[in-house]
Amino acid sequence: MADYWKDVLPVDPYVVKSRSMLQDIDRQIITQLYQPLIGPVAFSLYMTLWGELEQNRLWGGESTHRQLMGMTQSNLKTIHQEQGKLEGIGLLKVYMKESERQERLFIYELLPPLRPNEFFEDGMLNVFLYNRVGKTKYQQLKQFFTHPAISEDAKDITRPFNHAFESLQPSEWKLTSDMEETVRLAEGSEYTSVGQSPSYTITEDVFDFDLFLAGLSETMIPRKAMTQQVRDTIKKLSYLYGIDPLQMQNVVMSAIDERDVITTEALRKAASDWYQIERNGQLPDLVEKTQPVHLREGEQPAEEDSLDGKLIALLEAISPKKLLQDIADGTEPSKADLKIIEEIMFEQKLEPGVTNVLIYYVMLKTDMKLSKNYIQKIASHWARKKVKTVREAMKLAIEENRQYLEWAEGKTKSSKRNQKVIREEKLPDWMTEKETASDSESGQQKLHPQDLEEQKKKMMEEMQKLKKYSAY
């Protein structure tokens, strides 16, 4: 169902529904806490959908995607891309209802944001926000959503229900058969709710619970302590901090209390302490993640003898931040470059190894500079292609090199037909042989031999830098 948008037509209808009554506090939370994470376009899409509910409470009227395209001034691909951010962060659910006549109706259910206390104690979103807006703005936002608590020395003297209504007669509590039918909720209906905040989801393949539990006896961690909330928190913390199942055993054991209870707050603190000990106090960051083990090629001796194999192993083993540092002779990457990479990793959900191939390719094409628009365009293209491994990314870069060149040069196909273009480009050596063969077959102009040798020399120099500064 992830590719349903490819078949969506502008005339296809949709309706907007809200999980609960959205209020002004929800608007403030989304504007100030979520917008820095999802970006202005996704934020605008949420507000546009919300606007259809203003006069209709929890359900809006039927509209078409053409009308939505007109309201947002976006095409269906862009709407789908921004919609994905809302889905991933827990602000939107999408349903498709198909009739017997093959007519489809899309239902967009708006979900309220996390409450401020839930957001700032989440362990993932709050860290992501901190890295997006910086320490000063983060503190300002946190201050905005906090207020003084009731003093601890104040005594609660609230009267209970049974004291306030002690004079009620037994007849007033009697439930008759006629009343039972009246109070029962009709099938297919749900009560109006306010402020329910379902959390975003992390897929099950992020963490191996079987391996985690295999090393823990019932005495050490009672299974009753492993509630669904605890499991969800473990998945989030594993993804955020890069904690594997065996390491997580120690984290959980340090979080359980004397009553055999594990709280989410204790888990977050234990995971944070573990991470800061491992990383000398540094906060987690998407750009410091490496390619997941299940998406690596593993040991392949035959491939290791080739440059392709060595490069794949390298790009799988290091983080995007480390790659940028290695390319710059060990110099710390600029905050601007890191922000660009972090944005594409989060928004396009690219794996770290795939991101490395993208960095490697783009920097060679743009004289060792990260062009934001160029890298974002290729990243969104790879995300739609569902590229997950380093080899897949390299293969796609080879196959679609000319298309990327057109994007970089800003030229249309019509202009390319009207003039002869001599391309003087930087080609990674893992692309050179295949690109040359392709050029020969298609009759298109190739790189001059002198330029090609110069670029191969530069590429080998860059590879030596990577080998010097990277251990894999």
From Swiss-Prot:
The record's account of how the chain is modified after translation: In early growth phase only full-length protein is detected, during late growth and stationary phase full-length and C-terminally truncated proteins are seen (at protein level). Truncated protein is only seen in cytoplasmic fractions.
Protein species of origin: Bacillus subtilis (strain 168)
Short name of any one Pfam family annotated for the protein: DnaB_2
Induction text: Transcribed at constant levels during exponential growth. Present in all growth phases (at protein level).
More info: The dna-1 (dnaBI) and dnaB-19 (dnaBII) mutants show different characteristics for replication and membrane binding of plasmid pUB110. DnaBI is essential for both chromosome and pUB110 replication, whereas dnaBII is necessary only for chromosome replication.
Basic and acidic residues: compositionally biased ranges: 421-437, 448-465
Name of protein: Replicative helicase loading/DNA remodeling protein DnaB
Locations listed in the record: Cytoplasm; Cell membrane
Region (Disordered): 415-472
DDBH2-1: annotated segments: 210-302
Phenotypic consequence of A379T: In dnaB19; impairs chromosome replication initiation, origin region no longer associates with cell membrane at 45 degrees Celsius. In dnaBII; required only for chromosome replication
Record function comment: Helps DnaI load the DnaC replicative helicase onto single-stranded (ss)DNA. During DNA replication from the origin of replication (oriC) in the DNA replisome, DnaD is required after DnaA, before DnaB and before subsequent helicase DnaC loading. Component of the replication restart primosome, which reloads the replicative helicase on sites other than oriC. DnaB, DnaD and DnaI may also be required for a PriA-independent pathway of replication fork restart. DnaB and DnaD work together to allow DnaB access to ssDNA.
Outcome reported for the amino acid change (mutating Y374A): Improved binding of phiX174 ssDNA, increased oligomerization
Subunit description: Homotetramer. Also forms higher-order oligomers, can be induced by some ssDNA. The DNA replisome assembles sequentially on oriC in this order; DnaA, DnaD, DnaB, DnaI-DnaC helicase. In atomic force microscopy forms a square with a small central hole. Part of the replication restart primosome which assembles in this order; PriA, DnaD then DnaB. The preferred DNA substrate mimics an arrested DNA replication fork with unreplicated lagging strand. Interacts with DnaC, but probably not as a tetramer. Interacts with DnaD but no interaction with PriA was seen. Interacts with cell cycle regulator CcrZ.
Region feature (DDBH1): 1-112
Region feature DDBH2-2, mapped onto this chain: 303-411
Swiss-Prot/TrEMBL GO biological process terms: DNA replication; DNA replication, synthesis of primer
Keyword Membrane: yes
Domain notes: Bind ssDNA via the N-terminus (residues 1-300), which also mediates tetramerization. A region in the C-terminus (residues 365-428) also binds ssDNA, dsDNA and is responsible for DNA-mediated oligomerization. Has 3 domains with homology to DnaD called DDBH1 and DDBH2 (DnaD DnaB Homology 1 and 2) followed by a short positively charged region and a probable C-terminal alpha-helix. Removal of residues 429-472 increases dsDNA and some ssDNA binding, while removal of 312-472 prevents all DNA binding.
Summary of the knockout phenotype: Essential, it cannot be deleted; in depletion experiments DNA replication slows as soon as the protein is degraded and replication stops by 1 hour.
Coiled-coil boundaries: none
GO molecular function: ATP binding; DNA binding
Family note: Belongs to the DnaB/DnaD family.
